[in-house]
Amino acid sequence: PVIGDFHADMEFGTGVVKITPAHDPNDFEVGNRHNLERICVMNPDATMNENALEFNGLDRYVAREKVVERLKEDNLLIKIKEITHNVGFSERTDVMVEPYLSKQWFVKMRPLADRVLEVQKTNNKVNFVPKRFEKILLHWMEITYDWCISRQLWWGHRIPAWYKGDEVYVGMEAPKEEGWVQDVDVLDTWFSSALWPFSTLGWPDNMDSRYFPNDVLVTGYDIIPFWVCRMVFQSLHFTDNIPFKDCLIHGLIRDKQGRKMSKSLGNGVDPMDVIEEYGADSLRFFLTTNTAPGMDLRYDEEKVKSTWNFINKLWNASRFVLINMEDFKKEDYTLDNLNDQDKWILTKLNQTIKEVRKSMDKYDFNIVGNTLYSFIWNDFCDKYIELSKFNQNNTTKSVLLKVLTDILKMMHPFMPFVTEEIYSMLPIKESESIMISSYPVYNKKEIYKEEKENIDNILEFITSFRNKKAELNVGSDFQVISYIQNKENESLIFNMLKLNDKICDENKEINSEIVEYNGLRIDILYDNSKNLEEEKENLQKEKENLLNSISRREKLLSNVNYVNKAPANIVEAERNNLQKEKDQLKIVENKLSNM
């Protein structure tokens, strides 16, 4: 028969296409719509059967050539044209796969899918993070069709069906009578894995309700139709409950250019090679904290290396704490008599705990990573450890231990091996393993606003002083006059800046520069005659380099072809760099004019 169907592409070829409902998935659907007979013309070994008439017994490849020859003989062949077509090949044998109509086992999907759609309208639904991925679940449940669960594979759970002649038996146990033969097929792997949330907990007998429903499933968006959907409807059917409360979706790992990793491109990365060079914790921290939920991640070895440096920073900070606590005992631990810097770090710690817990609850691991990185590197290692060196009493040692312990606990989900190792060496700990210790809790009593502002002020002043000293290029050849009224603050600043041997008389006649910040002031006294010419020469060189670079960038950005054809992010980066260089040029010119 000649039939009309929207499957035919009117823009391709003649707009007319032959169909074989028994040998093509799309043709099968067309045949169903028009009640066409499904005529199988192949044997299971891919030779032609009696329905192929004169081609009966021929191999499929030979038969195709014979069909073309016959068309030529009958003057029915108009032309032969090569086209690009999707043809399935076996991954193992590299042989073309022929769709073949056969009897299989199916799951009737419509009742199961409707149950999912109903549950997702209630408060007892599966919450997707990000929420937009729920649409994939709903879409597949709306358009669902019966699911073929038979697979012709060696490995897998056997289909629980037995045959004896025309009789069929399905059950958990094999028939006791002789003569029954079990189905040779196995269950689709997604059918078996969809039972995971409850089958591992004792189902169908004595299921452990402490762990079901599971709290969260973490998976990629590419297998929502294959796995997530099926876990949801299997769980609803067998347990009358959802399999997990939250479903956290992550993206794919791509190469540095944003391409999907594949064998053909040769851009895949063996994680074992990365672990061998940088350690498992470096790779784990990079993968878990460098992208937002649902977003793809570009693999960047430099970022893994950066994480490795971060781990070394934490390791060295831990060594400092442990070395200073060699004789520290449990009875020495005290948080009494805290000074301002102790209160500062405890305030920063509790602010970090609050932000980390909030972000962990929302699965914003990228925010958690940035928050912990900033606190550990900037606040704990670079600032507090330096501040603590000038006051090594039991209170400061106790604060160091408390902060380090809470850092290890917060970092443990992202760096399990290093944190467990350091935790095992702590002189005082609540449990043998960090895995069974309590997670840090925000303590509003350890928020010291006034003391935090004071230390923030001092640290900003120290930064300003160092910047001014570098700008003057005075090295160690300078003296200072202090106008800091608070002697405790002055002592802290002088210790941090190593100024104790540089105090001089206010009346000394020499060039001076004032460093002032929020009520703190120190005058730097120096002899600039030695460095003036050298500094002027360096500034002139910097000015020339900036002018050359600005000229090059302006020429590039004035090229219409470049602006239109180059990636937008590259063009934008060029514009940003141009503006930065123009700003720096103004600074250099001002310095030269003031000399």
Predicted regions and their residues:
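NTP-handling and nucleic-acid-processing catalytic cores
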Residues: 1-45, 116-150, 154, 176, ...
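Residue patterns forming the tRNA-binding/recognition surfaces of aminoacyl-tRNA synthetases
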Residues: 3-166, 227, 259, 265-310, ...
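Secondary-structure transition/capping motifs at alpha-helix termini
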Residues: 32-39, 69-79, 174-181, 201-212, ...
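Short secondary-structure subsegments characteristic of cysteine-rich extracellular domains
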Residues: 52, 160, 216, 302-307, ...
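Gly/Pro-rich turn-and-neighbor structural signature
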Residues: 140-191, 195, 374, 404, ...
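Short alpha-helical scaffolding segments that buttress acidic/His motifs in well-ordered protein cores
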Residues: 144, 190-194, 224, 231, ...
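Acidic, turn-prone loop/beta-hairpin segments
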Residues: 163, 180, 255, 288, ...
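C-terminal low-complexity, glycine/proline- and small-hydrophobic-enriched intrinsically disordered tails
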Residues: 426-595
